Amino acid sequence: MGEGSTDTPQGVGHGGSHVPVLLKEAIDFLAVRRGGTYIDATVGLGGHSYEIAKRLGAPGHLIGLDKDPAALAVAGVRLQASGVSEPDWPTVTLLHRSFAEIAKGQRPATIDGVLADIGVSSLQLDDAARGFSFQADGPLDMRMDPRSERTAEQVVNHLDERELADVIYEFGEERRSRRIARAIVRSRPIRSTAHLADVISAAARPMNKLQDKYEKRRIHPATRTFQALRIFVNRELDDLRALLSAAPRILKPGGRVVVISFHSLEDRIVKDAFREGGTKYKHFRVLTKKPVTASEEEQDRNPRARSAKLRAAERV
């Protein structure tokens, strides 16, 4: 995970450069303290981790988490190379772990900051064999962690029609969920991303000229269903709630948590957690009354930034 998430059909990287969305804004809100201890909860390709490490310096400690061992390998090479070439470099520890386990092994009030960039990385999207994108045909996998048992193929082929429709509606906010679920069940078995995308596209075909005019302005008809399956397979929203619940326990007073999300389901969870943490439990001071979004310049350079929203809070 990490370094941006997208529900757009392109499934491309960050303008080809792997620069994370809202990089400057995220680092500014994190307010890295030299010599501190920070957690990058979604290492991805190491873009955020690199910027944090540069500011930490040799006395500091950066802990990086990711479900995806392939992402950790890429980030590890980058960060290790920097550690060799730059003398003032912090200790870096990379762990194959979900951000839901952010508090594992951490003592209370010992962390200066937590950063989480939620969703799919370009490394995952661009690999057809991972099954995250319908832009290239591949197996219906969608697991961020290959150790997980549940795959998108199992979900698509084994949930009953009602359960499948509920998943598509709840996690994809897809208003045509029942029609799509019915088409999927009738088309079983479905083994590939291309087959699934074709089934969804046919099921979501506009019913009249007015709807057709509206649909032409929309995203690809399979986008929301693919999002729903990915979230369900990886338990993404449950993991996000676990992270937000654990963060106050491990943060020092004055420590910050910064979260970048890419769709309304995630943003709503972050917004509610920060607001409740500030008003009910009194352990957060919200730093972003409204979510921070990408500048027009960044959006022009990287269309994936258009849906990004950053929220930040400080431990009190």
Where are the model-predicted features located?
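S-adenosyl-L-methionine-dependent methyltransferase catalytic core, i.e., the SAM/SAH-binding region
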Residues: M1-V316
